[in-house]
Structures are given as structure tokens and as C-alpha cells.
Amino acid sequence: MLSSQTSSIFTVSRLNQTVRLLLEQEMGQVWISGEISNFTQPASGHWYFTLKDDTAQVRCAMFRNSNRRVTFRPQHGQQVLVRANITLYEPRGDYQIIAESMQPAGEGLLQQKYEQLKAKLQAEGLFDQQHKQQLPSPAHCVGVITSKTGAALHDILHVLKRRDPSLPVIIYPTAVQGDDAPGQIVRAIELANARGECDVLIVGRGGGSLEDLWSFNDERVARAIFASRIPVVSAVGHETDVTIADFVADLRAPTPSAAAEIVSRNQQELLRQIQSAQQRLGMAMDYYLANRSRRFTQIFHRLQQQHPQLRLARQQTALERLRQRMGFALEARIKQATQRQQRVSQRLSQQNPQPRIHRAQSRIQQLEYRLTENIRSRLSEQRERFGNAVTHLEAVSPLATLARGYTVSTTTDGKVLKKIKQVKAGDIMTTRLEDGWLESEVKSVTPGT
């Protein structure tokens, strides 16, 4: 009889191991509520305590890497909600739970509801970015849905008055805490949409516990915000408080004051922007005028450089240089001829060739005469060419035309007026006379017949 059952015999170690595996695999992770007792924290930083109710108790451990995420200090007798894994301590055969997270019992139940509703609405797409409405910029009227006696309303109105005193504000007073609050918030959102007075809504309240903020975790409020045709800015609690309303709203503000900052324009900043734009415009105008003045000066200098008198002066200078060069050349030729004559005379005096001397002298005289006549002819030609050039320049000079009573008119950008279609009534034009300029306004334009 004993031999047939030997395959079912467990050692104590194997039994405890098998039970541990069954507990861990079958039970998995569970939520347990109970009262804390025998709480200890050794130097290792781990927590050891007993979780009990009226009729039973279980040993619990919460290791340091998990308990450092707990936001409160557990106390003896405190009711808590623990998320834990069930296991068995094999050396003693004691089963225990290993806690992963811990919350006060009341908040823990609310947190469970919060997570369940969040998952549900997220699955339905209420949090999707594609459904978010664009906030008006700027807003012309702001609706505020909150308690009329709360600090949140005071903060919102204070910021709006400071930033944009002229911005209209409509208050839709509601309860923000208690059983009636979700229904009132929903009705206020629906009323604001029905009246259509505002182009943006701030829905929120001041900070508080999870229970205090629970109205903004209500499914009815979330669906009313999602259905609102008016963009909604949520402003619930402090920056660390995140509600279901924050996920559904078109934009979440960390605080009520921040919501007021978001929906309003800063008039002082707007004034500074206008002043900055005026300064930039003034600088642009100054630069344009300076550039046009510089351009006018350049054109004026070019016209001066092309003045007939300057051209005549340059021609006279060139002619004088030519005359000097010709004089120097003549003197050099005469000097060379004289020197040659002297050398020849010296040789002839030594050889006494009188006939050759007479011929050479005659030849020299002829050369001197021809050279002199050639120089005189060249000088006469140059004087004649110079006179013709002067006559031609005076004939084509704009000043000569102006001296005969004609004028030249130009537009403000320096273009010479040739046809009446270049101007229209009201334009300013500049007229050049012989002795100066006139600036005039075109009163009318009449085509020629």
C-alpha cells in the first residue's frame, strides 16, 4: 500500500515550493484593503507590517524600491488599500503578501474608479488630439465656470484685469465639490454653449484632496466638456493635480491663474510690440530717405563731372600739354640741327670745303623753314579742332538749351519727363532752369492734340 503512493510523497521543501508556485501563478496580483499593525522599518529601508481586519490578518512586506513611491507615512491602525503579489516564505511555510503600492483606503477606491474611467474614455477616443479645438486668439469674451466664492475665481479675475481690463468676462457659478457639483458643472457648460456669448471657457477650481477634486473626475462632466462647441481650458487644482477633465479639455492649465494668462492678451506687451514696430518703421524710413539722398548726391556729382565747362577745361589742359610737348620737340630738333651744323662746320673748317658748306647751310635753312612751317600748320590744325570741339560742346550743352528759355523736368526718382503719362495729378516734379531748380506739384494732366 505504501509503495503505490511513494510517487505522491512530498518533502517539506518541495511542498512549500509547490504551494508558493501555485499561489503566485494562480492568484497573481490582487488589491487588498485592511488595517496596518506591527509596522516596522529596519535599517535596510524595507517595510514589514501586518494587514488585518476584524477576523483575520496576513503578514506583509514592502521593499524599499516600492515603498519610496508611497506619498504618506503609514501609521498603526490606518486603513489602507494595497496592491500586492501573494507568495509563501518557504523556510517557515508562512504565506505573505509583497506590496507593490499603497494608498489610504478612501483615496485608493477613488483612484481605482479614476483609472477605470480614464481607460474607458481613452478607449472611446475622448482624449485624442484630433478632437482638440483651437483656442481663439485673441479671445473676445471669456466664460468662467467655477464657484463664485472660491479662490480660483478671484485669481482668474485678478489676472484678467491685470492683463486685459477691457476683456468681457461672464461667470457661470456652480458648486465644485459635493454630490450636486457634477450636475451643476454640466448644466453650466450646456448653458454657455446655448447662449453663445463666449468664445472660450475656463472650467476649474482651486486645489484640494482627491475627494475634493472628484467632481472633475465625473464621467458626465468629461462628456459635457467633450461635447462643448466652445473651446474649454481646464484649470483644476495645482499643477500636480490631473483630473479626467484635464484629459478631455482642449487645453489643460496647471492653475486657474495660468488659465487666465493663456486666454488673455497682455495689453502692456501688445503696447510694447506696437512701439517696437513703430521704431522699426521709423528706422526703415530713415534708411530709405538716407539712401535716396545718397543716390541724389551721386547723380548730382556725375552731372557736375559731365558739365561742358569741365570738359572744355580738360580739353584745354590736354591741348596745352600737346603744345608744350611740340615746343620741347622743336627745341630739341633745333638743338640737334645746330649741333650737327657745328660739327659739320668744324669738319669743313678743317678741310675748307666752302661749296659744301654753302650747300649744307642752304639745306639747313630749308629744313628749318619746313620744320617751322610744319609746326605752325600742326598748331593751326589743333587750334581749329579745339575751336570746333568747343563750338560742338556748347551746341549740345543742356545749359545752352536752358539759356534759350527751355527747361528740363524730372520725377522724384530722377527720371526725365518726356511724356505726360509719366505723371499724374498730385505728383511732385523738379524743373531745371538756367540758374537753378524749381519743385512743383502737378495740378492736372492734359494730353496734347
Curated annotation (Swiss-Prot):
Cellular localization per UniProt: Cytoplasm
Tagged with keyword Transmembrane helix: no
Keywords, ordered alphabetically: Cytoplasm, Exonuclease, Hydrolase, Nuclease
Keyword Nuclease: yes
Annotated catalysed reactions: Exonucleolytic cleavage in either 5'- to 3'- or 3'- to 5'-direction to yield nucleoside 5'-phosphates
GO molecular function: exodeoxyribonuclease VII activity; nucleic acid binding
One annotated Gene Ontology cellular component of this protein: exodeoxyribonuclease VII complex
GO biological process: DNA catabolic process
Family: Belongs to the XseA family.
HAMAP family, sorted: Exonuc_7_L
Role summary: Bidirectionally degrades single-stranded DNA into large acid-insoluble oligonucleotides, which are then degraded further into small acid-soluble oligonucleotides.
Assembly: Heterooligomer composed of large and small subunits.
Entry-linked NCBIfam families: xseA (TIGR00237)
UniProt protein name: Exodeoxyribonuclease 7 large subunit
Species per Swiss-Prot/TrEMBL record: Salmonella schwarzengrund (strain CVM19633)
Organism taxonomic ancestry: Bacteria, Pseudomonadati, Pseudomonadota, Gammaproteobacteria, Enterobacterales
